[in-house]
């Protein structure tokens, strides 16, 4: 009995006793929460003061950057970390941009251009890298600190001052920093897509950069170009008569899927087999002669291997014409061949000069220097083959 009575007195406290102890425990928890909040507020204030000091050109003391980094890491672990982006936009960046804007807000003309260029140099070279270093623990989240800072600079400074009027003035000298600023800001986009502020920025870029390919087309000093943009590759060469540069015509292919030539076979000439010499020549395989549009004018030009001319009027229907090898031996005397003294430069000049008058392409007649030999390469019907 004594043992049971002793166990009864040693048992857990009653509910009334627990009720008396709850206010003390709750007060301890509340004091701990208040201490954590006070510590978080102190961290917020230190980050706020450090960022504002950067915008005020005061810089950061030694070891201050490390302290701010640790403060940002601690805040991200608390319940206040979810509001970090909103606090950065509404408090830190907005106040900092207003500090920079107030110094140039009432400037106009050339003074505004020079002051804005100096402000951009300071922001882009000092403020932006420092902000990225302070908020380094936040990297990987979208939108990034760099993107938020550039968007606030665009909306608070670039689009709020009288920059368009300053650029529209005659004899305005645009500093290179202004062009850099506009092009850098043009590369920053919002999650909503193209906004009205972005289109206003493009209007400013058109006054500095020409030509400029914007959201709604190509702009130049003469005005917007509504036609489609065509990239043209220009080839320049030296004329035979002098140093005049001429434009090379574009050689177009009528079919990109059907090859014009079949594989080439090699065989030894019959006439040289008995003499013991091993001379090989390439047999001319089947070449499809595709019809070309009408209206070409013959423009003969002397080349090293034949005559270049345009194709005559094609006949109707498909292109079944074939190229057949000549019946006579391919070997010719030294008097009938192409001149051996022709250099590659002369060859290129002759080809380009013969093609200057043809806007559709280059057509080659595989002749041997005489009209009689050219007829051997003609397809049935007297139509020369076209490459």
Swiss-Prot record:
Does this entry carry the keyword Cell cycle?
yes
Which portions of the sequence form the region Disordered?
A: 13-34, 262-387
Cellular component GO terms, alphabetical: TORC2 complex
**Annotated InterPro entries:** Bit61/PRR5, Cullin_repeat-like_dom_sf
Comp. bias (Basic and acidic residues): 18-33
Modification Phosphoserine occurs at = 253, 373
Sequence similarity: Belongs to the PROTOR family.
Assembly and binders: Associated component of the mechanistic target of rapamycin complex 2 (mTORC2). Binds directly to MTOR and RICTOR within the TORC2 complex.
Q: What does this protein do?
A: Associated subunit of mTORC2, which regulates cell growth and survival in response to hormonal signals. mTORC2 is activated by growth factors, but, in contrast to mTORC1, seems to be nutrient-insensitive. mTORC2 seems to function upstream of Rho GTPases to regulate the actin cytoskeleton, probably by activating one or more Rho-type guanine nucleotide exchange factors. PRR5 plays an important role in regulation of PDGFRB expression and in modulation of platelet-derived growth factor signaling. May act as a tumor suppressor in breast cancer.
Identify this protein by name.
Proline-rich protein 5
Please tell me the species this chain comes from: Mus musculus (Mouse)
User: What gene name is listed for this protein?
Assistant: Prr5
């Amino acid at each position: 009995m004594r043992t049971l009575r002793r166990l009864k007195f040693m048992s857990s406290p009653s509910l009334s006793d627990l009720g008396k102890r709850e206010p003390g425990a709750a007060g301890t928890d509340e004091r701990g929460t208040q201490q954590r909040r006070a510590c978080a507020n102190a961290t917020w204030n230190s980050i706020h003061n450090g960022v504002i000091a950067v915008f005020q050109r005061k810089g950061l003391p030694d070891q201050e950057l490390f302290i701010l980094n640790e403060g940002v890491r601690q805040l991200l672990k608390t319940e206040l970390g979810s509001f970090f982006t909103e606090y950065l936009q509404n408090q830190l960046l907005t106040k900092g941009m207003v500090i920079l804007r107030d110094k140039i807000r009432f400037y106009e003309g050339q003074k505004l251009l020079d002051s804005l260029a100096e402000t951009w140099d300071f922001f882009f070279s000092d403020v932006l890298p420092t902000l990225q270093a302070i908020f380094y623990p936040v990297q990987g989240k979208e939108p990034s600190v760099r993107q938020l800072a550039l968007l606030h600079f665009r909306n608070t400074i670039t689009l709020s001052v009288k920059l368009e009027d300053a650029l529209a003035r005659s004899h305005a000298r645009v500093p290179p920093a202004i062009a850099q600023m506009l092009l850098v800001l043009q590369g920053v986009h919002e999650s909503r897509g193209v906004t009205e502020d972005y289109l206003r920025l493009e209007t400013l870029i058109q006054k500095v950069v020409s030509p400029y390919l914007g959201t709604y087309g190509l702009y130049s000093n003469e005005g917007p170009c509504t036609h489609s943009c065509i990239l043209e590759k220009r080839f320049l060469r030296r004329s035979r008569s002098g140093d005049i540069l001429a434009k090379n015509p574009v050689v177009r292919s009528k079919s990109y899927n059907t090859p014009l030539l079949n594989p080439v076979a090699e065989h030894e000439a019959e006439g040289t087999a008995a003499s013991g010499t091993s001379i090989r020549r390439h047999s001319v395989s089947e070449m499809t002669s595709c019809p070309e549009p009408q209206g070409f004018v013959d423009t003969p030009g002397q080349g090293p291997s034949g005559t270049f001319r345009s194709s005559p009027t094609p006949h109707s229907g498909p292109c079944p014409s074939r190229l057949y090898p000549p019946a006579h031996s391919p070997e010719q005397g030294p008097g009938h061949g192409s001149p051996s003294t022709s250099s590659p430069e002369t060859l290129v000049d002759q080809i380009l000069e013969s093609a200057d008058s043809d806007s559709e392409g280059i057509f080659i007649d595989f002749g041997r220097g005489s009209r009689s030999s050219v007829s051997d390469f003609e397809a049935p019907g007297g139509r020369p083959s076209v490459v």
